[in-house]
Curated annotation (Swiss-Prot):
Protein name (Swiss-Prot/TrEMBL): Ribonuclease 3
SUPFAM superfamilies registered for this protein in UniProt: dsRNA-binding domain-like (SSF54768), RNase III domain-like (SSF69065)
Gene this protein is translated from: rnc
PROSITE patterns: DS_RBD (PS50137), RNASE_3_1 (PS00517), RNASE_3_2 (PS50142)
One Pfam short name: dsrm
Localization per record: Cytoplasm
Keyword rRNA-binding: yes
GO process terms (BP): defense response to virus; mRNA processing; regulation of gene expression; rRNA processing; tRNA processing
Similarity comment text for this entry: Belongs to the ribonuclease III family.
NCBIfam families linked: RNaseIII (TIGR02191)
GO molecular function, a single term: double-stranded RNA binding
Enzyme class of the recorded protein, top EC level: hydrolase
One GO CC term on file: cytoplasm
Annotated RNase III domain residues: 1-134
């Protein structure tokens, strides 16, 4: 934790008052499950809070930055900015991936490189920062880390995987694409959806996500990867 504190201080001028919050933000459920007797807290609740404040601040930014964009345009752009892959990238940019506490099994299976875990970590950190320093501190951090990428227009040029898949398949002729929920597991605050993509009656791929939309995106991403190998 000492090295993480030094990183936050030197790179982002952030000094946490409540180090328990910071430690919780960097504790994955797999680590907490392996240390139940120690009553270790994990970062899912902070992730929930961080997701909400991230959506708010990015919405504020887009509203002020693009006065001529419609609600639909801003929603699409916000989705691109806060998508899982983007947040995982920001975790890596901040070197957060080096400090997350994972269970032994998760560590061995490559969890430290997994976008889902790193995206959740970034949101959990924002939640901890909100509770410790307030929303203005979160705004300053995002202005330093995320907004410069948005200013460069990197996200405006990104299409979502569902759109890319639809455009690719349509080049092959008329196709019927259907996204079907296979399963829905877990408590309300930590849902896990599995979705399949059915094209002309045949299953093309499957995907997982914390919401139906994220699972659909994951399935479309997997489908594009499969089709690129054909």
């Amino acid at each position: 934790m000492k090295q993480l504190e030094e990183l936050l201080s030197t790179s982002f001028d952030i000094q946490f008052n409540d180090l328990t919050l910071l430690e919780t933000a960097f504790t994955h459920t797999s680590y907490a499950n392996e240390h139940r007797l120690l009553n270790v807290s994990h970062n899912e609740r902070l992730e929930f809070l961080g997701d909400a404040v991230l959506q708010l601040i990015i919405s504020e930014y887009l509203f002020a930055k693009y006065p001529k964009k419609t609600e639909g345009d801003m929603s699409k752009l916000r989705s691109m900015i806060v998508r899982e892959e983007s947040l995982a990238g920001f975790s890596r940019f901040c070197s957060f991936d080096a400090y997350i506490k994972l269970g032994k099994g998760e560590e061995k299976s490559g969890g430290r490189r997994r976008d889902t875990i790193l995206g959740d970590l970034f949101e959990a950190f924002l939640g901890a920062l909100l509770l410790d320093k307030g929303i203005d501190a979160v705004r300053r951090f995002l202005k330093q880390v995320m907004i410069p990428q948005v200013e460069k227009g990197n996200f405006e040029r990104v299409k979502d995987y569902k759109t890319c898949l639809q455009e690719f398949l349509q080049t092959k002729g008329d196709v019927a694409i259907d996204y079907q929920v296979i399963s829905e597991k877990g408590p309300a605050h930590a849902k896990q959806f599995e979705v399949s993509i059915v094209v002309n009656g045949a299953v093309l791929s499957k995907g997982l996500g914390k919401s139906k939309k994220l699972a659909e995106q994951d399935a479309a991403k997997n489908a594009l990867a499969q089709l690129s190998e054909v």
